[in-house]
């Protein structure tokens, strides 16, 4: 996955049930 903006990279992952950072 390509680096995203902080706001876009920060999302709620339903599978992990937590907040994940897409770097």
Swiss-Prot record:
In Gene Ontology terms, what is one molecular function of this protein?
metal ion binding
Q: Which GO terms describe its cellular component?
A: periplasmic space
Q: Where does heme bind?
A: 23
Instruction: Enumerate the residue ranges of region (Disordered).
Output: 1-23
Keywords tagged on the record = Electron transport, Heme, Iron, Metal-binding, Periplasm, Sulfate respiration, Transport
In its record, the post-translational modification comment is: Binds 4 heme groups per subunit.
Its subcellular locations are: Periplasm
UniProt keyword annotation of Repeat present: no
Which GO terms of type biological process are on file? anaerobic respiration
Q: What domain of life does the UniProt record list for this protein's source?
A: Bacteria
Is RNA-binding one of the keywords UniProt gives this record?
Answer: no
Per its database record, what is this protein's job? Answer: Participates in sulfate respiration coupled with phosphorylation by transferring electrons from the enzyme dehydrogenase to ferredoxin.
Q: What is this protein called?
A: Cytochrome c3-1
């Amino acid at each position: 996955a390509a680096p995203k903006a902080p706001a876009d990279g920060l999302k709620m992952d339903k599978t992990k049930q937590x907040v994940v950072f897409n770097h």
